[in-house]
Amino acid sequence: MAIVLPDSILSNPGLSYIRRMVLRRAYVIASVDLPRQTFARSDTHTMTSVLVLQKFTEGERRMVAETGRPPEYEIFMAIADRVGWDLRGNPVYVRTPEGEEVLRKTTRNVTTRNAKGEVIEISKEVEEAIVDDQLPAVTQLFENWLAQKSPRWLHV
């Protein structure tokens, strides 16, 4: 399961009971910090993180209750600085050191009319700016980490 939490819940000393509750009930598989502009298009500028969790089995919960602490394990952690738009929700594109937008060629299907006036669909090669979004790369890194680690405790 994945949850989006305000960073204040993850770092506020007065809310440590929430963090303890999570650690007594689930493995934190991943923690990904998101930039302030992540939810800017929803008029929210709260710093947030995504936590990927896996609930403990009943046996694991009993073990945590008996020992008073969760087991030790590795956690995937990442920080995404860019999500494809700025604080106002405007698109942000990858740029060269000189400030020019980086373009890539791609094929698009375009609906048009032929000489007879019939509606047809054609493939057209176009150049488009690349959205500056790190989340696909973070996702790929997480998938690679999972494949490499294949944690023994991960219940798929």
What is each stretch, according to the model?
Residues 2-156:
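A conserved structural/catalytic subdomain of Rossmann-like adenosyl-cofactor enzymes
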